[in-house]
C-alpha cells in the first residue's frame, strides 16, 4: 500500500488461527475477500484483474493432518497456475512470490571433522569448513531416528565414523524434507519453477526460517517458540526447553520478511529462484528463552524436562548470501524481535488458556514425547 499498489487479500479466517474473525489490523484501504485459496471459485474471483500474487496461504502445524498439508499448501499452488493459464485475459498475473520454508532442507547440511574434533557447535557457521581433513566432509543427513530421540541423544552423528557433526549454513540447494508440511512446501517449489517456466509466469520461492514478531497467532499448536515461551513466562511458569535447549535456530523478524517479499517481487534477478530468508545469526533455543525471560522481566529459569517434538530438526541456520546479493539484509536483531513480540502479546486476551490446550493436544496425538533416559527436569 505504501508503494502505491492496490492490494486485495484472500483469507478464509480459519478459526484455529483467527477465532475472532477478521483481525483489526487489516488495512481499510486493502480489499478483503473472505474465501479459501484451495477453492477454485474463491481463488478465481480473487485473481481477476490481478498483476502480482503473494501466495502466503498455508496450513502449519505439528499435528498429523497429512492430507490437509498437501491440500492447502500444494494443491492451492497448483490451482493457482491452473486458473491463470485457463484465462490469461481475466487473470493477467505477471509474477508470483511463494512462501516456502526452511523445513524443506530437512536436517540440513553438516560437516564431519572426525572423531574427537573439538570446538563449539557454531564453529563452521562462522568460518569455512576445511577442504581436506580427518573426517568425512560435508554431509546431508536424514532425520534422527525415534530410537535416538527416545535415548536422549540429540546431536547428529556421522554414519561412517559416529563423530558428532558440526552444522553448516544451509544453502538453497539443500533439500531433504521429512515432515508432511515440509514435503508440501517442497512440492510448491517444484510447481513454481516447472509450471512458471512452462507458462511464462516468473516465480520466486522464499524459504523463511523461524519468523517471529507481533500478530503471530498463538491459537494453533504450531505458533512457535516465542509464543510458547512468552505465554508460560507471563503466566508465572518457566519456559520448557525441548531436547536440551542447545538447538541452533535462525530467527527473523516479520518486517524483514515483508521487505524480502517486496524485493523478490520487484527484482527480476530473483525470478525462478529459491531464496533463503533468515536472521543471519545462530541463536540457541536456551539463549532465546533467556532473552524472553529478560523481556518479560522474569527471574525464572528455563527447564529441560527431557521432552522432544517429533519432526523437529536439530540445528537450522540459513545461508542468506544469495538474497544479500540482491540487496536485502536483516535489520531487526533478535533482542528487539523478542521485546516487540512480548509487548504485543501482553495486550491479547485469553492467550494462556490456548497454550495449555495446544500442548495437551500435541501430547495426546504423540507429537510431544519424552525420552526414555533419565527424565528428571534440569535447570539450565
Residue ranges and their predicted role:
Residues 1-208, 379-380:
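N-terminal Rossmann-like NAD(P)+-binding domain of SDR-like oxidoreductases, especially those catalyzing
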Residues 2, 234-380:
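C-terminal substrate-binding subdomain of Rossmann-fold SDR/epimerase-dehydratase oxidoreductases
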Residues 16-17, 105-108, 214-215, 284-285, ...:
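A short beta-to-alpha transition loop/helix N-cap that caps and shapes the active-site region
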Residues 58-62, 101-104, 210-216, 246, ...:
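Active-site proximal helix/loop that lines the substrate pocket
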Residues 65-68, 216-221:
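Short, solvent-exposed loop/turn segments at secondary-structure boundaries
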Residues 77-78, 186-193, 226-230, 259, ...:
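Conserved active-site helix of classical SDR/Rossmann-fold NAD(P)-dependent CH-OH oxidoreductases
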Residues 138, 156, 165-177, 203, ...:
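A conserved pocket-lining segment of Rossmann-fold NAD(P)-dependent short-chain dehydrogenase/reductase
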Amino acid at each position: 500500500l505504501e508503494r502505491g499498489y492496490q492490494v486485495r487479500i484472500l483469507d478464509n479466517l480459519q478459526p484455529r488461527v483467527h477465532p475472532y474473525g477478521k483481525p483489526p489490523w487489516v488495512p481499510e484501504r486493502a480489499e478483503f475477500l473472505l474465501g479459501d485459496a484451495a477453492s477454485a471459485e474463491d481463488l478465481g474471483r480473487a485473481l481477476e484483474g490481478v498483476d502480482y500474487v503473494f501466495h502466503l496461504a498455508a496450513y502449519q502445524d505439528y499435528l498429523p493432518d497429512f492430507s490437509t498439508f498437501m491440500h492447502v499448501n500444494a494443491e492451492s499452488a497448483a490451482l493457482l497456475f491452473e486458473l491463470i493459464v485457463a484465462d490469461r485475459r481475466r487473470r493477467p498475473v505477471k509474477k508470483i512470490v511463494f512462501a516456502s520454508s526452511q523445513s524443506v532442507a530437512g536436517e540440513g547440511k553438516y560437516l564431519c571433522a572426525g572423531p574427537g574434533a573439538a570446538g563449539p557447535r557454531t564453529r563452521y557457521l562462522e568460518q569455512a569448513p576445511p577442504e581436506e581433513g580427518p573426517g568425512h566432509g560435508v554431509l546431508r543427513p536424514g532425520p534422527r531416528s525415534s530410537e535416538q530421540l527416545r535415548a536422549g541423544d540429540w546431536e547428529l552423528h556421522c554414519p561412517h565414523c559416529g563423530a558428532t557433526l558440526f552444522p553448516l549454513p544451509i544453502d538453497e540447494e539443500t533439500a531433504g524434507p521429512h515432515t508432511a508440511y515440509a514435503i508440501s512446501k517442497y512440492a510448491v517449489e517444484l510447481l513454481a519453477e516447472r509450471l512458471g517456466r512452462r507458462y511464462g509466469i516468473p516465480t520466486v520461492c522464499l524459504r523463511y526460517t523461524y519468523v517471529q514478531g507481533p500478530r503471530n497467532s498463538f491459537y494453533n499448536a504450531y505458533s512457535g517458540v516465542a509464543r510458547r515461551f512468552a505465554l508460560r513466562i507471563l503466566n508465572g511458569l518457566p519456559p520448557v526447553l525441548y531436547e536440551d535447549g542447545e538447538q541452533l535456530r535462525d530467527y527473523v523478524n516479520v518486517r524483514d520478511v515483508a521487505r524480502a517479499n517486496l524485493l523478490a517481487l520487484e527484482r527480476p534477478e530473483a525470478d525462478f529462484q529459491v531464496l533463503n530468508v533468515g536472521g543471519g545469526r545462530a541463536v540457541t533455543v536456551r539463549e532465546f528463552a533467556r532473552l524472553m525471560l529478560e523481556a518479560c522481566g522474569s527471574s525464572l529459569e528455563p527447564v529441560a524436562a527431557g521432552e522432544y517434538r517429533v519432526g523437529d530438526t536439530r540445528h537450522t541456520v540459513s545461508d542468506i548470501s544469495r538474497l544479500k546479493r540482491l540487496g536485502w539484509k536483516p535489520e531487526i536483531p533478535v533482542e528487539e524481535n523478542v521485546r516487540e513480540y512480548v509487548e504485543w502479546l501482553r495486550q491479547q486476551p485469553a492467550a494462556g488458556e490456548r497454550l495449555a490446550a495446544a500442548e495437551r493436544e500435541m501430547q495426546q496425538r504423540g507429537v510431544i514425547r519424552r525420552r526414555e533416559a533419565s527424565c528428571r527436569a534440569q535447570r539450565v
